[in-house]
Amino acid sequence: MQEARATTKYQRVSPYKVRLVIDQIRGMQVESAMNLLAFSKKRVAGVVRQTLKSAVANAEENLGLDVDTLVVSQAYVDQGPSMKRFKPRARGRATRILKRTSHITVAVCPQVD
């Protein structure tokens, strides 16, 4: 089965927050997934939407697939490297803060009847 994918790496948002959006679009038709992401209130929905648009463009351009029949076959997020920062606390101490990054991958394939 032909499958087109797109990846967005080093996105400065925690993987937990991305998974909330990614889990909603897995298995959906591309058009309905685009609508869901366009009207989502989550900030990361815009990044996931751009990744999905890139996967659709890859399917159309590289594989010659029909856009109307595409389904989100895979959608997952992996944790990228974390930036370590320090936050000042009481009594001269400091605690470490992790600024997490994400690698977002979306794959689309034609719907099987």
From Swiss-Prot:
PROSITE patterns: RIBOSOMAL_L22 (PS00464). GO terms for cellular component: cytosolic large ribosomal subunit. The keyword DNA-binding does not apply. Keywords: Ribonucleoprotein, Ribosomal protein, RNA-binding, rRNA-binding. GO terms for molecular function: rRNA binding; structural constituent of ribosome. It comes from the Bacteria. GO terms for biological process: translation. The keyword RNA-binding applies. Pfam families: Ribosomal_L22 (PF00237). Belongs to the universal ribosomal protein uL22 family. Part of the 50S ribosomal subunit. PANTHER family: CHLOROPLAST 50S RIBOSOMAL PROTEIN L22-RELATED (PTHR13501), LARGE RIBOSOMAL SUBUNIT PROTEIN UL22M (PTHR13501:SF8). This protein binds specifically to 23S rRNA; its binding is stimulated by other ribosomal proteins, e.g. L4, L17, and L20. It is important during the early stages of 50S assembly. It makes multiple contacts with different domains of the 23S rRNA in the assembled 50S subunit and ribosome. This is Large ribosomal subunit protein uL22. It comes from Magnetococcus marinus (strain ATCC BAA-1437 / JCM 17883 / MC-1).
